[in-house]
Amino acid sequence: MEAKLQVALDFLEMSRALVVAREAVDGGVHWIEAGTPLIKSEGLDAVRILREEFPEHTIVADMKTMDAGRTEMESAAKAGASVAVVLAAASESTIRECVEAGRNYGFKVQMDLVSHPDPVRRAVEACEWGVDIIGVHCPID
């Protein structure tokens, strides 16, 4: 499997995120992440704009979903996300709903292990439930 380089756009302003995204793409990045701060500030329009600007790239929506899995994943998919993120701390039913939404809408589901007390066990469970990508994320705070 070929390694993929991802840039996380953890900004509050879309204009700043686009500058960094363009520079990252020029530098060879493969995946562009609409970070949680950007989505909270700009809404899913951030994903729509990234999809429009970079139609050939993988667009990740770092939703950090904890509940309402199907609804949040559907929203990300309709905005143009290639990958949407659910937290490992979410319930099994929420994670399974995210996976089902991913299958229905044709995108991948990434589970973020950030701060989970038993990340190895949860990663194994997630694979059994059909999660596509396991993310190992260290918090910045």
Task: Label the model's feature ranges.
Residues 1-70, 126-129:
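Conserved N-terminal beta1-alpha1 strand-loop-helix module at the mouth
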